[in-house]
Protein backbone atom coordinates (compact mmCIF):
# COMPACT_ATOMS: atom_id res chain seq x y z
CA UNK A 1 0.00 0.00 0.00
CA UNK A 2 1.22 3.57 -0.64
CA UNK A 3 2.88 5.52 2.13
CA UNK A 4 1.22 8.81 3.02
CA UNK A 5 3.26 11.81 4.14
CA UNK A 6 2.00 15.14 5.43
CA UNK A 7 2.71 18.29 3.41
CA UNK A 8 5.08 19.83 5.91
CA UNK A 9 7.29 16.76 6.10
CA UNK A 10 7.21 16.39 2.31
CA UNK A 11 8.22 20.02 1.78
CA UNK A 12 11.04 19.71 4.30
CA UNK A 13 12.32 16.58 2.53
CA UNK A 14 11.75 17.26 -1.17
CA UNK A 15 10.83 20.92 -1.28
CA UNK A 16 7.38 22.44 -1.78
CA UNK A 17 4.96 20.83 -4.23
CA UNK A 18 1.82 21.90 -6.10
CA UNK A 19 -0.31 24.19 -3.96
CA UNK A 20 2.40 24.91 -1.40
CA UNK A 21 3.29 28.54 -0.83
CA UNK A 22 6.62 30.25 -0.14
CA UNK A 23 7.41 33.74 1.15
CA UNK A 24 10.22 35.56 -0.64
CA UNK A 25 12.82 36.93 1.79
CA UNK A 26 11.12 39.20 4.36
CA UNK A 27 8.66 40.66 1.85
CA UNK A 28 4.88 40.38 1.59
CA UNK A 29 5.34 38.50 -1.70
CA UNK A 30 4.04 34.92 -1.73
CA UNK A 31 4.53 32.43 -4.55
CA UNK A 32 2.47 29.27 -4.99
CA UNK A 33 3.71 26.20 -6.84
CA UNK A 34 1.65 25.81 -10.02
CA UNK A 35 2.84 22.36 -11.11
CA UNK A 36 5.20 19.61 -9.94
CA UNK A 37 7.05 17.66 -12.65
CA UNK A 38 8.58 15.21 -10.19
CA UNK A 39 6.71 11.99 -9.37
CA UNK A 40 5.46 11.36 -5.84
CA UNK A 41 7.17 8.34 -4.36
CA UNK A 42 9.79 8.34 -7.11
CA UNK A 43 11.64 11.57 -6.31
CA UNK A 44 15.41 11.69 -6.54
CA UNK A 45 17.59 13.07 -3.78
CA UNK A 46 21.30 12.74 -3.11
CA UNK A 47 22.85 11.69 0.19
CA UNK A 48 23.69 8.78 2.45
CA UNK A 49 20.85 6.28 2.44
CA UNK A 50 19.01 8.29 -0.19
CA UNK A 51 17.99 7.77 -3.81
CA UNK A 52 20.81 8.72 -6.19
CA UNK A 53 22.85 5.54 -5.71
CA UNK A 54 24.03 2.92 -8.17
CA UNK A 55 21.14 0.74 -9.30
CA UNK A 56 18.59 3.01 -7.63
CA UNK A 57 18.14 6.61 -8.81
CA UNK A 58 21.44 6.37 -10.67
CA UNK A 59 21.50 4.04 -13.65
CA UNK A 60 24.26 2.75 -15.89
CA UNK A 61 23.71 5.30 -18.66
CA UNK A 62 26.94 6.81 -19.95
CA UNK A 63 27.30 10.43 -20.90
CA UNK A 64 27.55 9.44 -24.54
CA UNK A 65 24.29 7.51 -24.20
CA UNK A 66 22.42 10.48 -22.75
CA UNK A 67 23.20 10.89 -19.05
CA UNK A 68 23.40 14.53 -17.97
CA UNK A 69 26.49 16.26 -16.60
CA UNK A 70 24.61 17.80 -13.68
CA UNK A 71 21.16 17.35 -12.18
CA UNK A 72 19.56 19.98 -9.97
CA UNK A 73 17.01 18.04 -7.96
CA UNK A 74 13.56 19.20 -6.84
CA UNK A 75 14.12 22.87 -7.64
CA UNK A 76 11.34 25.45 -7.44
CA UNK A 77 11.67 27.37 -10.71
CA UNK A 78 10.54 31.01 -10.82
CA UNK A 79 10.55 32.35 -14.36
CA UNK A 80 8.44 34.52 -16.65
CA UNK A 81 6.62 31.45 -17.99
CA UNK A 82 5.68 29.80 -14.71
CA UNK A 83 6.37 28.74 -11.13
CA UNK A 84 6.99 25.00 -11.12
CA UNK A 85 8.79 22.27 -9.21
CA UNK A 86 11.09 20.15 -11.35
CA UNK A 87 14.44 18.47 -11.74
CA UNK A 88 16.74 20.29 -14.15
CA UNK A 89 19.34 18.56 -16.29
CA UNK A 90 22.48 20.30 -17.57
CA UNK A 91 24.74 19.08 -20.35
CA UNK A 92 27.57 20.75 -22.24
CA UNK A 93 26.97 23.91 -20.24
CA UNK A 94 23.33 24.24 -21.28
CA UNK A 95 19.91 23.37 -19.92
CA UNK A 96 19.04 20.09 -21.63
CA UNK A 97 15.86 19.08 -19.80
CA UNK A 98 13.31 20.24 -17.23
CA UNK A 99 11.23 17.43 -15.80
CA UNK A 100 11.82 14.15 -13.96
CA UNK A 101 15.31 12.88 -13.19
CA UNK A 102 16.27 9.35 -12.31
CA UNK A 103 17.15 5.91 -13.59
CA UNK A 104 15.12 4.96 -16.67
CA UNK A 105 15.87 1.27 -16.02
CA UNK A 106 13.62 1.24 -12.94
CA UNK A 107 11.42 4.35 -13.22
CA UNK A 108 8.82 5.48 -15.72
CA UNK A 109 8.69 8.96 -17.21
CA UNK A 110 12.37 9.81 -16.70
CA UNK A 111 13.41 12.72 -18.93
CA UNK A 112 16.75 13.37 -17.20
CA UNK A 113 18.90 10.20 -17.01
CA UNK A 114 21.31 10.13 -14.07
CA UNK A 115 24.46 8.12 -14.69
CA UNK A 116 27.88 7.52 -13.13
CA UNK A 117 29.11 10.73 -14.80
CA UNK A 118 26.40 12.93 -13.28
CA UNK A 119 26.99 15.51 -10.54
CA UNK A 120 24.12 16.40 -8.20
CA UNK A 121 23.09 19.79 -6.83
CA UNK A 122 20.38 19.74 -4.18
CA UNK A 123 17.64 22.11 -5.30
CA UNK A 124 15.06 21.00 -2.75
CA UNK A 125 14.02 23.91 -0.56
CA UNK A 126 15.57 26.38 -3.01
CA UNK A 127 14.24 28.73 -5.68
CA UNK A 128 15.89 28.52 -9.10
CA UNK A 129 15.97 31.52 -11.44
CA UNK A 130 17.81 32.47 -14.58
CA UNK A 131 20.90 34.59 -14.05
CA UNK A 132 20.07 38.28 -14.03
CA UNK A 133 20.82 40.51 -17.02
CA UNK A 134 21.93 44.10 -16.47
CA UNK A 135 21.89 46.14 -19.68
CA UNK A 136 22.96 49.51 -18.25
CA UNK A 137 26.57 49.10 -17.16
CA UNK A 138 29.16 51.86 -16.98
CA UNK A 139 32.33 49.76 -17.08
CA UNK A 140 34.14 52.01 -14.63
CA UNK A 141 36.03 49.28 -12.76
CA UNK A 142 36.37 45.50 -13.15
CA UNK A 143 35.46 45.00 -9.49
CA UNK A 144 31.84 45.61 -10.54
CA UNK A 145 31.81 42.12 -12.03
CA UNK A 146 32.35 40.38 -8.70
CA UNK A 147 29.69 42.52 -7.07
CA UNK A 148 27.24 41.75 -9.88
CA UNK A 149 27.70 37.98 -9.86
CA UNK A 150 27.48 37.99 -6.06
CA UNK A 151 23.97 39.41 -6.47
CA UNK A 152 22.87 36.83 -9.06
CA UNK A 153 23.57 38.82 -12.23
CA UNK A 154 25.45 36.85 -14.89
CA UNK A 155 25.21 39.03 -18.02
CA UNK A 156 26.31 42.67 -18.26
CA UNK A 157 25.95 44.95 -21.27
CA UNK A 158 27.05 48.56 -21.42
CA UNK A 159 29.97 50.73 -22.29
CA UNK A 160 33.10 52.27 -20.91
CA UNK A 161 36.86 52.05 -20.76
CA UNK A 162 37.48 52.29 -17.02
CA UNK A 163 37.31 55.40 -14.81
CA UNK A 164 37.64 57.85 -17.69
CA UNK A 165 35.56 61.00 -17.38
CA UNK A 166 33.44 60.00 -20.36
CA UNK A 167 32.76 56.54 -18.93
CA UNK A 168 31.84 57.95 -15.53
CA UNK A 169 28.95 59.73 -17.22
CA UNK A 170 28.08 57.72 -20.34
CA UNK A 171 27.68 54.02 -21.17
CA UNK A 172 29.80 54.14 -24.31
CA UNK A 173 32.95 52.34 -25.38
CA UNK A 174 33.93 54.79 -28.12
CA UNK A 175 35.90 53.66 -31.13
CA UNK A 176 37.44 50.45 -32.42
CA UNK A 177 40.57 50.67 -30.24
CA UNK A 178 38.65 50.82 -26.96
CA UNK A 179 36.13 48.21 -28.09
CA UNK A 180 39.01 45.85 -28.86
CA UNK A 181 40.63 46.34 -25.47
CA UNK A 182 37.35 45.80 -23.61
CA UNK A 183 36.65 42.62 -25.59
CA UNK A 184 40.09 41.37 -24.60
CA UNK A 185 39.42 42.28 -20.96
CA UNK A 186 36.19 40.27 -21.09
CA UNK A 187 38.27 37.10 -21.45
CA UNK A 188 39.33 37.48 -17.82
CA UNK A 189 35.90 38.09 -16.29
CA UNK A 190 33.47 35.31 -15.21
CA UNK A 191 30.27 36.74 -16.74
CA UNK A 192 28.76 37.27 -20.18
CA UNK A 193 29.65 40.69 -21.57
CA UNK A 194 28.85 42.97 -24.48
CA UNK A 195 29.87 46.54 -25.26
CA UNK A 196 28.02 49.54 -26.71
CA UNK A 197 29.76 51.90 -29.09
CA UNK A 198 29.14 55.64 -28.98
CA UNK A 199 26.10 56.43 -31.13
CA UNK A 200 26.28 60.22 -31.13
CA UNK A 201 27.07 61.19 -34.72
CA UNK A 202 25.22 62.85 -37.56
CA UNK A 203 26.88 60.77 -40.28
CA UNK A 204 27.18 56.98 -40.20
CA UNK A 205 30.80 56.18 -41.06
CA UNK A 206 32.23 56.23 -37.52
CA UNK A 207 29.25 54.29 -36.21
CA UNK A 208 29.64 51.62 -38.89
CA UNK A 209 33.28 51.32 -37.88
CA UNK A 210 32.38 50.64 -34.24
CA UNK A 211 29.79 48.00 -35.07
CA UNK A 212 32.25 46.22 -37.35
CA UNK A 213 34.76 46.33 -34.49
CA UNK A 214 32.35 44.20 -32.46
CA UNK A 215 30.06 46.62 -30.62
CA UNK A 216 26.83 44.76 -29.77
CA UNK A 217 24.84 48.00 -29.68
CA UNK A 218 25.07 51.78 -29.79
CA UNK A 219 24.40 54.29 -27.04
CA UNK A 220 23.07 57.82 -27.52
CA UNK A 221 23.86 59.98 -24.48
CA UNK A 222 22.98 63.61 -23.93
CA UNK A 223 26.46 64.38 -22.61
CA UNK A 224 27.71 63.63 -26.13
CA UNK A 225 24.78 65.45 -27.77
CA UNK A 226 21.59 63.48 -28.38
CA UNK A 227 20.19 65.63 -31.17
CA UNK A 228 17.44 64.60 -33.60
CA UNK A 229 20.10 64.23 -36.30
CA UNK A 230 22.19 61.91 -34.13
CA UNK A 231 19.12 59.86 -33.19
CA UNK A 232 18.10 59.42 -36.82
CA UNK A 233 21.62 58.53 -37.95
CA UNK A 234 22.24 56.06 -35.12
CA UNK A 235 18.97 54.21 -35.66
CA UNK A 236 19.71 53.97 -39.37
CA UNK A 237 23.01 52.25 -38.61
CA UNK A 238 21.34 49.93 -36.09
CA UNK A 239 18.72 48.88 -38.62
CA UNK A 240 21.42 47.98 -41.14
CA UNK A 241 23.49 45.94 -38.68
CA UNK A 242 20.78 44.48 -36.37
CA UNK A 243 22.04 45.96 -33.12
CA UNK A 244 20.09 47.75 -30.41
CA UNK A 245 20.17 51.49 -29.71
CA UNK A 246 19.95 52.75 -26.14
CA UNK A 247 19.12 56.38 -25.50
CA UNK A 248 19.60 58.93 -22.73
CA UNK A 249 17.66 61.92 -24.02
CA UNK A 250 18.14 65.68 -23.78
CA UNK A 251 17.35 66.81 -20.21
CA UNK A 252 17.77 70.49 -21.07
CA UNK A 253 15.54 70.26 -24.15
CA UNK A 254 18.22 72.18 -26.05
CA UNK A 255 17.91 70.34 -29.35
CA UNK A 256 14.22 69.61 -29.00
CA UNK A 257 11.51 68.32 -26.70
CA UNK A 258 10.22 64.80 -26.14
CA UNK A 259 7.95 65.22 -29.16
CA UNK A 260 10.99 65.95 -31.32
CA UNK A 261 12.79 62.88 -30.04
CA UNK A 262 9.75 60.70 -30.78
CA UNK A 263 9.60 62.21 -34.27
CA UNK A 264 13.31 61.54 -34.86
CA UNK A 265 12.92 57.91 -33.77
CA UNK A 266 10.33 57.44 -36.55
CA UNK A 267 8.73 54.38 -35.02
CA UNK A 268 11.97 52.40 -34.93
CA UNK A 269 12.90 50.11 -32.06
CA UNK A 270 14.80 51.81 -29.24
CA UNK A 271 15.65 51.04 -25.61
CA UNK A 272 15.04 54.11 -23.44
CA UNK A 273 17.25 54.19 -20.36
CA UNK A 274 15.93 55.51 -16.98
CA UNK A 275 12.66 56.38 -18.70
CA UNK A 276 11.33 58.23 -15.64
CA UNK A 277 13.99 60.90 -16.06
CA UNK A 278 15.91 61.19 -12.78
CA UNK A 279 18.78 59.40 -14.48
CA UNK A 280 18.46 61.80 -17.40
CA UNK A 281 16.09 62.67 -20.19
CA UNK A 282 13.68 65.37 -21.37
CA UNK A 283 12.50 67.28 -18.29
CA UNK A 284 9.86 66.86 -17.04
CA UNK A 285 8.03 64.51 -19.40
CA UNK A 286 10.35 61.86 -20.88
CA UNK A 287 8.21 59.35 -18.94
CA UNK A 288 5.57 59.80 -21.66
CA UNK A 289 7.60 57.72 -24.05
CA UNK A 290 6.72 54.45 -22.28
CA UNK A 291 3.39 54.54 -24.10
CA UNK A 292 4.99 54.23 -27.54
CA UNK A 293 4.69 50.80 -29.17
CA UNK A 294 8.28 50.77 -30.49
CA UNK A 295 9.89 51.83 -27.20
CA UNK A 296 11.46 49.35 -24.77
CA UNK A 297 11.38 51.34 -21.51
CA UNK A 298 13.66 50.60 -18.58
CA UNK A 299 14.47 52.00 -15.16
CA UNK A 300 17.74 52.27 -13.31
CA UNK A 301 17.78 51.16 -9.72
CA UNK A 302 18.39 54.32 -7.63
CA UNK A 303 14.71 55.28 -8.06
CA UNK A 304 13.58 51.70 -7.36
CA UNK A 305 11.43 51.90 -5.35
CA UNK A 306 10.43 55.41 -4.28
CA UNK A 307 11.45 55.89 -0.62
CA UNK A 308 11.91 58.74 1.83
CA UNK A 309 15.61 58.84 0.91
CA UNK A 310 15.32 58.80 -2.88
CA UNK A 311 15.19 62.53 -3.57
CA UNK A 312 17.85 63.50 -1.07
CA UNK A 313 20.54 61.16 -2.38
CA UNK A 314 19.97 61.92 -6.05
CA UNK A 315 21.22 65.50 -6.21
CA UNK A 316 24.76 64.81 -4.99
CA UNK A 317 24.87 61.62 -7.01
CA UNK A 318 23.97 63.49 -10.19
CA UNK A 319 26.50 66.28 -9.65
CA UNK A 320 29.36 63.77 -9.43
CA UNK A 321 28.25 61.48 -12.25
CA UNK A 322 27.80 64.20 -14.85
CA UNK A 323 30.88 66.24 -14.01
CA UNK A 324 28.87 69.21 -12.73
CA UNK A 325 30.04 72.04 -10.49
CA UNK A 326 27.90 72.94 -7.47
CA UNK A 327 29.29 76.50 -7.60
CA UNK A 328 27.74 77.08 -11.03
CA UNK A 329 24.02 77.94 -10.76
CA UNK A 330 23.27 76.53 -14.20
CA UNK A 331 24.77 73.16 -13.23
CA UNK A 332 22.69 73.05 -10.06
CA UNK A 333 19.55 73.97 -12.01
CA UNK A 334 20.31 71.21 -14.50
CA UNK A 335 20.56 68.68 -11.68
CA UNK A 336 17.43 69.87 -9.90
CA UNK A 337 15.36 69.69 -13.09
CA UNK A 338 15.87 65.93 -13.19
CA UNK A 339 14.75 65.05 -9.67
CA UNK A 340 10.94 65.06 -9.38
CA UNK A 341 9.03 63.20 -6.67
CA UNK A 342 5.92 63.06 -8.85
CA UNK A 343 7.50 61.18 -11.74
CA UNK A 344 9.48 58.86 -9.45
CA UNK A 345 6.27 57.91 -7.61
CA UNK A 346 4.53 57.28 -10.93
CA UNK A 347 7.41 55.06 -12.01
CA UNK A 348 6.59 52.60 -9.22
CA UNK A 349 3.04 52.23 -10.51
CA UNK A 350 4.03 52.04 -14.17
CA UNK A 351 6.25 49.09 -13.29
CA UNK A 352 3.40 47.40 -11.47
CA UNK A 353 1.12 47.92 -14.46
CA UNK A 354 3.73 46.42 -16.79
CA UNK A 355 4.25 49.66 -18.71
CA UNK A 356 7.97 49.76 -17.81
CA UNK A 357 9.51 46.47 -18.92
CA UNK A 358 13.15 46.36 -17.71
CA UNK A 359 15.19 47.29 -14.63
CA UNK A 360 18.98 47.80 -14.76
CA UNK A 361 21.66 49.36 -12.56
CA UNK A 362 23.50 52.35 -14.11
CA UNK A 363 26.54 51.02 -12.26
CA UNK A 364 28.60 53.62 -10.35
CA UNK A 365 26.99 56.32 -12.49
CA UNK A 366 23.79 56.88 -10.52
CA UNK A 367 23.19 53.19 -9.89
CA UNK A 368 24.30 50.20 -7.83
CA UNK A 369 25.49 47.15 -9.74
CA UNK A 370 24.82 44.71 -6.90
CA UNK A 371 21.22 45.75 -6.21
CA UNK A 372 19.31 45.18 -9.46
CA UNK A 373 17.43 42.08 -8.32
CA UNK A 374 17.00 43.34 -4.75
CA UNK A 375 15.45 46.63 -5.81
CA UNK A 376 13.23 44.96 -8.38
CA UNK A 377 11.53 42.84 -5.74
CA UNK A 378 11.52 45.68 -3.20
CA UNK A 379 9.44 47.54 -5.79
CA UNK A 380 7.12 44.55 -6.16
CA UNK A 381 6.72 44.38 -2.37
CA UNK A 382 6.02 48.11 -2.06
CA UNK A 383 3.40 47.95 -4.78
CA UNK A 384 1.63 45.01 -3.15
CA UNK A 385 1.55 46.82 0.17
CA UNK A 386 0.32 50.08 -1.38
CA UNK A 387 -1.83 48.86 -4.29
CA UNK A 388 -2.98 45.45 -3.12
CA UNK A 389 -3.39 42.26 -5.10
CA UNK A 390 -2.57 42.55 -8.80
CA UNK A 391 -5.17 41.56 -11.38
CA UNK A 392 -4.68 37.84 -11.99
CA UNK A 393 -3.51 37.18 -8.43
CA UNK A 394 -5.56 36.33 -5.35
CA UNK A 395 -5.33 36.22 -1.58
CA UNK A 396 -3.22 33.05 -1.75
CA UNK A 397 -0.39 34.13 -4.04
CA UNK A 398 1.33 36.87 -6.04
CA UNK A 399 2.33 34.67 -8.97
CA UNK A 400 1.28 37.14 -11.67
CA UNK A 401 3.20 39.95 -10.02
CA UNK A 402 6.27 37.76 -9.46
CA UNK A 403 6.35 36.61 -13.08
CA UNK A 404 6.04 40.24 -14.17
CA UNK A 405 8.93 41.41 -12.03
CA UNK A 406 11.31 38.49 -12.69
CA UNK A 407 10.88 39.18 -16.41
CA UNK A 408 12.19 42.73 -15.93
CA UNK A 409 15.66 41.47 -14.97
CA UNK A 410 15.91 38.31 -17.09
CA UNK A 411 14.02 37.66 -20.31
CA UNK A 412 13.01 41.21 -21.25
CA UNK A 413 16.52 42.71 -21.30
CA UNK A 414 17.59 39.58 -23.20
CA UNK A 415 14.91 40.11 -25.84
CA UNK A 416 15.61 43.84 -26.05
CA UNK A 417 19.28 43.25 -26.85
CA UNK A 418 19.04 40.13 -28.98
CA UNK A 419 20.40 37.73 -26.36
CA UNK A 420 17.31 35.60 -25.74
CA UNK A 421 18.48 32.79 -28.02
CA UNK A 422 21.29 32.24 -25.48
CA UNK A 423 20.28 33.52 -22.03
CA UNK A 424 17.45 35.10 -20.05
CA UNK A 425 15.26 32.22 -18.92
CA UNK A 426 15.16 28.72 -17.47
CA UNK A 427 14.38 26.99 -20.76
CA UNK A 428 15.82 24.04 -22.64
CA UNK A 429 18.67 25.03 -24.94
CA UNK A 430 19.69 28.15 -23.02
CA UNK A 431 23.12 28.59 -21.46
CA UNK A 432 22.98 27.18 -17.93
CA UNK A 433 23.38 30.54 -16.20
CA UNK A 434 21.31 29.70 -13.14
CA UNK A 435 20.91 31.02 -9.60
CA UNK A 436 19.81 29.02 -6.56
CA UNK A 437 18.33 30.99 -3.66
CA UNK A 438 17.28 30.01 -0.19
CA UNK A 439 13.76 31.51 0.04
CA UNK A 440 14.70 33.56 3.10
CA UNK A 441 17.54 35.17 1.15
CA UNK A 442 15.78 35.45 -2.21
CA UNK A 443 16.85 38.47 -4.21
CA UNK A 444 19.51 39.40 -1.67
CA UNK A 445 22.23 36.75 -1.42
CA UNK A 446 22.26 33.78 -3.80
CA UNK A 447 23.31 30.42 -2.45
CA UNK A 448 24.86 29.24 -5.71
CA UNK A 449 25.50 30.87 -9.10
CA UNK A 450 26.17 28.65 -12.11
CA UNK A 451 27.84 29.98 -15.26
CA UNK A 452 27.58 27.77 -18.29
CA UNK A 453 26.72 24.79 -16.11
CA UNK A 454 29.64 25.20 -13.68
CA UNK A 455 29.61 26.80 -10.24
CA UNK A 456 31.12 30.28 -10.42
CA UNK A 457 30.00 31.77 -7.09
CA UNK A 458 28.65 30.34 -3.85
CA UNK A 459 28.12 30.96 -0.18
CA UNK A 460 31.08 29.27 1.46
CA UNK A 461 32.34 28.89 4.98
CA UNK A 462 35.83 28.69 6.44
CA UNK A 463 38.13 27.03 3.88
CA UNK A 464 40.13 25.47 6.74
CA UNK A 465 37.07 23.94 8.39
CA UNK A 466 36.34 20.22 8.34
CA UNK A 467 33.02 20.84 6.55
CA UNK A 468 31.87 23.66 4.22
CA UNK A 469 29.44 25.35 6.61
CA UNK A 470 31.34 26.85 9.60
CA UNK A 471 31.49 30.62 9.58
CA UNK A 472 32.30 33.10 8.47
CA UNK A 473 30.02 32.18 5.56
CA UNK A 474 29.99 34.63 2.70
CA UNK A 475 29.90 34.68 -1.08
CA UNK A 476 33.13 33.66 -2.76
CA UNK A 477 34.29 32.91 -6.31
CA UNK A 478 34.31 29.23 -7.24
CA UNK A 479 36.19 27.16 -9.84
CA UNK A 480 34.31 28.40 -12.92
CA UNK A 481 35.72 31.84 -12.09
CA UNK A 482 39.33 30.68 -12.44
CA UNK A 483 41.88 29.60 -15.01
CA UNK A 484 40.93 27.94 -18.24
CA UNK A 485 37.42 27.12 -16.97
CA UNK A 486 36.33 30.75 -17.04
CA UNK A 487 36.22 31.50 -20.75
CA UNK A 488 34.22 28.44 -21.91
CA UNK A 489 31.69 29.05 -19.13
CA UNK A 490 30.86 32.49 -20.55
CA UNK A 491 29.79 34.23 -23.74
CA UNK A 492 30.81 37.52 -25.30
CA UNK A 493 28.11 39.21 -27.37
CA UNK A 494 29.18 40.92 -30.59
CA UNK A 495 27.49 42.26 -33.66
CA UNK A 496 27.18 39.81 -36.54
CA UNK A 497 29.28 42.29 -38.51
CA UNK A 498 32.06 41.95 -35.95
CA UNK A 499 31.99 38.18 -36.26
CA UNK A 500 31.97 38.40 -40.05
CA UNK A 501 34.99 40.71 -39.86
CA UNK A 502 36.90 38.12 -37.83
CA UNK A 503 37.17 40.22 -34.66
CA UNK A 504 37.45 37.25 -32.24
CA UNK A 505 40.28 35.71 -34.26
CA UNK A 506 42.09 39.00 -34.77
CA UNK A 507 42.02 39.74 -31.04
CA UNK A 508 42.75 36.18 -29.95
CA UNK A 509 39.61 35.96 -27.82
CA UNK A 510 39.16 32.76 -25.81
CA UNK A 511 35.57 33.32 -24.70
CA UNK A 512 33.01 31.99 -27.19
CA UNK A 513 31.63 34.92 -29.18
CA UNK A 514 28.02 34.90 -30.36
CA UNK A 515 25.98 37.47 -32.28
CA UNK A 516 23.12 39.56 -31.00
CA UNK A 517 20.11 39.06 -33.25
CA UNK A 518 16.52 40.13 -33.85
CA UNK A 519 16.91 43.50 -32.14
CA UNK A 520 15.06 45.46 -34.81
CA UNK A 521 11.34 45.56 -35.48
CA UNK A 522 10.47 44.54 -31.93
CA UNK A 523 8.56 46.58 -29.38
CA UNK A 524 6.53 46.54 -26.20
CA UNK A 525 4.44 43.64 -27.50
CA UNK A 526 7.51 41.37 -27.25
CA UNK A 527 8.16 42.21 -23.59
CA UNK A 528 7.07 39.24 -21.48
CA UNK A 529 4.40 40.07 -18.87
CA UNK A 530 5.13 43.80 -19.33
CA UNK A 531 3.20 44.94 -22.41
CA UNK A 532 0.99 47.77 -21.10
CA UNK A 533 0.74 50.84 -23.37
CA UNK A 534 -1.01 53.58 -21.39
CA UNK A 535 -1.31 57.10 -22.73
CA UNK A 536 0.95 58.96 -20.30
CA UNK A 537 0.71 62.72 -19.75
CA UNK A 538 2.68 65.00 -17.42
CA UNK A 539 1.38 68.29 -16.06
CA UNK A 540 4.15 70.78 -16.95
CA UNK A 541 3.49 72.89 -13.84
CA UNK A 542 2.93 70.29 -11.11
CA UNK A 543 4.76 67.32 -12.74
CA UNK A 544 1.79 65.10 -11.88
CA UNK A 545 1.64 62.01 -14.08
CA UNK A 546 -1.55 60.62 -15.58
CA UNK A 547 -2.01 57.28 -17.35
CA UNK A 548 -5.15 57.03 -19.47
CA UNK A 549 -6.46 59.99 -17.49
CA UNK A 550 -5.81 58.47 -14.04
CA UNK A 551 -3.42 60.21 -11.63
CA UNK A 552 -0.47 57.98 -10.75
CA UNK A 553 0.84 58.71 -7.29
CA UNK A 554 1.99 56.83 -4.22
CA UNK A 555 3.70 57.55 -0.93
CA UNK A 556 7.42 56.97 -0.42
CA UNK A 557 8.29 53.85 1.55
CA UNK A 558 9.46 54.51 5.09
CA UNK A 559 11.02 51.06 5.47
CA UNK A 560 11.85 48.29 3.01
CA UNK A 561 12.40 44.54 3.19
CA UNK A 562 15.53 42.90 1.76
CA UNK A 563 17.59 45.67 3.35
CA UNK A 564 19.54 46.16 6.60
CA UNK A 565 18.27 42.92 8.12
CA UNK A 566 20.53 41.10 5.64
CA UNK A 567 23.71 43.13 5.93
CA UNK A 568 26.11 43.72 8.81
CA UNK A 569 27.21 47.09 7.42
Curated annotation (Swiss-Prot):
Binding site for Ni(2+) 1: 136, 138, 219, 362
Listed GO MF terms: nickel cation binding; urease activity
Location in the cell: Cytoplasm
Essential cofactor(s): Ni cation
Annotated binding of Ni(2+) 2, by residue: 219, 248, 274
Metal-binding among keywords: yes
Residues the entry annotates as binding substrate: 221
Modification sites for N6-carboxylysine: 219
CC annotations in GO: cytoplasm
Subunit-structure text: Heterotrimer of UreA (gamma), UreB (beta) and UreC (alpha) subunits. Three heterotrimers associate to form the active enzyme.
Protein name: Urease subunit alpha
Organism (species): Synechococcus sp. (strain RCC307)
